[in-house]
A protein has these predicted regions:
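Active-site segments that bind and position negatively charged phosphate/pyrophosphate groups
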Residues: 203-314
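A glycine/threonine-rich phosphate-anchoring loop and its flanking beta-alpha core
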Residues: 16, 114-207
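ATP/NTP phosphate-donor binding region
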Residues: 1-98
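Generic secondary-structure signature for well-ordered alpha-helical cores
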Residues: 59, 91-94, 160-163, 169-176, ...
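Residue-level signal for inorganic ion chemistry
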Residues: 18, 40, 78, 129, ...
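C-terminal charged capping/lid subdomain of soluble metabolic enzymes
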Residues: 2, 184-186, 286-368
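Solvent-exposed alpha-helices and their adjacent loops that cap or buttress functional pockets
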Residues: 7, 32-33, 93-95, 118-120, ...
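Short glycine/serine/threonine-rich phosphate/pyrophosphate-binding segments
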Residues: 107-114, 135-136, 253-254
Length: 368
């Protein structure tokens, strides 16, 4: 077992990473939190695979549990689905000592976290992530959100979980696209914080792709959580240092929005976004050709998915300008000067973004 503490001024909490720990979820909740009433929010896929394991674990510890199930996919991160969940929660007569368990990937974690943070002015939330992306990134840090037609994560809250419970073994049922999506975030941590971890991950991609040695997988997931916990602990509300976690997300969110939130997984779009923002760093003279080529070679080993056919340069810029990170019309990107060491958030102009997009298009042709 690995334990990572997220140290915040008012809402510190543990992340527990342990292989084959899903069946002990109820025991951990009883010992650490002591809640007796709760509701599990999950999706159809996760419920079919692991729902009974979680249900048994919770009920064996005397918890009264209800379950709300949504359709899998980014489409569930919507006002309509959130509204339905509010109505269903109200019918359950929950009280403020009840707990919401977000049991699923990033979509479920964001959606359940948002609904839990706003229903009855805020219920305690426990994150039980089941995808690589959710385990290493979205379940930690307290950001919750739903999407609007005009952009991703435009409605959301900061609501730290009571605890994050991670069982890396459940990753064995992920699709290759979901693994690749999560690996985008894993590699991001290496590039912004720990270059040695980046190259170690590149050298052992099969550990994630084949869900290999549980101890090694546990250690890698733990390292990601340690990095995010340190960053969030120093900047909980995303006003400074935490912005480096958005590496690849400015361009990536534009690509994801342009694909209609479905053609590409979030992490896949972020991989493309990281390459685009690395190209801007290269174009500004921050990275040498050698360093850029080495990192590019590593990222393209992930068998990148196709970019949306109908996403033009103009439409990409339109989506990027709608992004919630824009301030006073200024677009910022995370630019890498020295991997793992020297990272800055800097203003980026439309001309540079167009150049990055043209590079991505040319790279797609050369790759495929």
């Amino acid at each position: 077992m690995n334990l990572v503490e997220v140290g915040l001024e008012e809402a510190s909490y543990p992340i527990i990473i342990e292989a084959s720990s899903l069946s002990s979820t109820g025991e951990v909740i009883r010992k650490r939190i002591g809640r007796k009433r709760g509701v599990v929010i999950t999706d159809e896929t996760v419920d079919e695979l692991y729902g009974s394991d979680l249900d048994d674990s919770l009920r064996n510890e005397g918890m009264k549990i209800d379950k709300l199930v949504v359709e899998p996919g980014e489409g569930s991160k919507s006002l309509d689905v959130a509204g339905r969940l509010y109505q269903e929660l109200a019918e359950l007569n929950l009280h403020r000592d009840s707990v919401v368990l977000a049991f699923g990937g990033g979509v479920v974690g964001d959606l359940a976290g948002f609904v839990g943070s706003t229903f009855l002015r805020g219920l305690p939330v426990i994150q039980v992530p089941t995808t690589l992306l959710a385990q290493v990134d979205s379940s930690v840090g307290g950001k919750t959100a739903i999407n609007l037609a005009r952009g991703k994560n435009l409605v959301g809250t900061f609501h730290q979980p009571e605890i994050v419970l991670i069982d890396p073994v459940v990753l064995e049922t992920l699709s290759s696209a979901d693994v690749r999506s999560g690996l985008g975030e894993v590699l991001k941590y290496g590039l912004i914080w720990d270059e040695n971890f980046f190259w170690k991950t590149v050298e052992s991609l099969e550990l994630f792709e084949e869900v290999g040695d549980p101890e090694e997988l546990e250690a890698s997931v733990s390292r990601c959580c340690e990095i995010k916990a340190e960053v969030v602990g120093r900047d909980e509300l995303d006003k400074g240092l935490r912005q480096i976690l958005n590496f690849g997300h400015t361009i990536g969110h534009g690509i994801e929005a342009g694909s209609g939130y479905g053609e590409l997984k979030h992490g896949e779009a972020v991989i493309w976004g990281m390459i685009g923002e690395l190209w801007i760093s290269l174009n500004r003279g921050y990275l040498t050709d050698e360093t850029f080529d080495q990192i590019l070679g590593a990222l393209t080993r992930l068998s990148l998915p196709a970019l949306p056919d109908d996403l033009t340069n103009a439409r990409l810029l339109e989506y990027i300008h709608r992004d919630k990170k824009v301030r006073d019309g200024v677009i910022n990107c995370v630019l890498i000067k020295e991997p793992g060491e020297d990272i800055d958030v800097e203003r980026v102009g439309d001309t540079e973004l167009k150049g990055a997009w043209e590079f991505l298009r040319s790279l797609e042709v050369s790759q495929g």
